Amino acid sequence: MSLLSVSSVLLAQKERLKVELSSSASVSSNSELNPLWSYSNQWGIYSQYEQAELVVHGKARYDLLDKDSVDLQVGLGVVGSTNFDHSMIHEAYLKGRFYMIDFTVGMEAFSPLAKYDDLTSGSYLMSSNARPTPRIGLGIFDWWSIPYTRDWLQIKGGCYLGMLFDEDNPKYTKDVILHEKFAYGRLGGWYVKPYLGLVHSVMMGGTSPTGEDIPIDFWASFLGKRSEKFRDISSMRGEATNAAGGHQGLWDMGLDVDFVGNKVHFYYQRMFKDNGGTKPFGTLNKDHIMGIHVSFNDSKWLSAISLEWMRTSDQLGDGTPDPIGYDKNGNLIAVYPGDVPLDEKGFWKWIYSHFTQADIEAWENETGWILNQWCYLKFLREHWDNGPHGGRKNYLNNGLYYQGWSAGGLSIGTPLFHSYTTQVKYMNGEGKTPNYAFFTNNRVDAITVGLSGGDGNKLSYRLKYTFSKNHGSLCEKYEGGAFGLHRFEDYFYTTSKKEHYIVINVDYKLSESLSINAMLSADWGELYDAVALRIGAKYNIRVKR
């Protein structure tokens, strides 16, 4: 084929090239920590610890196909920083659509769930907070009306399979597979559209810091089921009795309202980690994210407003995940699901190997119950008197995977959780945090307010403010972590700590291609104080063929 004919084909396919070049310089008043909203929910482009930083960010997307039924693009993005360790290939992907089916391969700064991350605290899972990780994705990423329903039944959903980065930390598990999926349904066809969705994220496989290979049972992890592949590995008993891999989930429900062109989105989300919180309308789980986002049709200076309340402080209470206590031999034992045989002979053999007849009779006389296979959990709880078990959910953390749901030192979920590295910087040697897991402050109650607008032409702004009460972690405050029975007397979060986060971003278009921007952010409260300023410019190139 001649060069002329190739060019004709490209022209007929309406291929186009989009290039965006930006540069910025920032400085912070705090030599250890930058204000939260100066770097969060921005795909990990900016450093959370560099006091002064110059960043150059370039990205390009090239449309290979652009048809009604199919499109295909390739993209590449790079970040250069005066902090050389923060320089990286940020994006490299192939993505497209075949009829209603979307697909992607590689690292792309995109999440189908991150809708209002610039005005809210951000998505609890699959957020825009950290740098993109390599993955393959397939699904219907936006609402699609089921044929012959006249838009009354709409669905969206998708599955991703990828890898976490092998970062230089001796505590990290290497070669970790990350699987994420979501499924939503909505009643459309009217100006009020109720919806319900489920999001599930799971880590599986890898090599532990001790060099031990973690078996992969894909379908058990996919479905959140236990796996016999872990039965003979003493350090991974929980995978054989609870669920294979590390799991996080989210129920997402709400209303989309379109009123005279103004769009209102009400949402209520409930996070969970295992069966203890999987019921979308159950009363056991008290943690949630609820909010409202309003986009105004004809308003310029106030084009959108959001209000959100996040609570993750309960985590089903202080009780250990499973029953734990001292048996008649003085041994501290944790009882996992499946440890106690349910057949008559096996059950009593297990009971008498750990408890005396006097223990059993004392409990039966006090409660009026008769011990058997179906009430042994009540016996264990009340005999050991350590409170209800099934708590300490430790959101976005996992015992097998120290790094939890993080990439590049940032949460791939909500940015309001603090890592151990961050906490050490603001503790200033006060109190104690033993560092059992990556996120040492994941019990947070927060209110976030966001505003955006402009003159409708050249000037635009975004303002976001968050007030938070930080309670640390239920696992970090006990000696021994998740199954610890004794609290640290000098735990840093013995009392909750209040913190404020605020940011304002202003953009001004000098031309269709060139704009300048400024960001002013500040944090203050009982954790740390910091003020940061960033100024920058952005240049866009769009070529249509």
Residue ranges and their predicted role:
Residues Q13-L54, L65-L76, I155-L161:
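Transmembrane beta-strand segments of Gram-negative outer membrane beta-barrel proteins
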Residues K18-E20, Y49-H57, S87-E91, T133-G137, ...:
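Transmembrane beta-barrel architecture of outer-membrane proteins
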Residues S23-S31, Y62, L76-T82, F98-M100, ...:
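Transmembrane beta-strands of outer-membrane beta-barrel pores
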Residues D66-F98, F110-N129, E167:
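Surface-exposed loop and membrane-interface regions of Gram-negative outer-membrane beta-barrel proteins
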Residues P194-L198, P209-G211, P215-R545:
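Exposed, low-structure sequence patches enriched in small/polar residues
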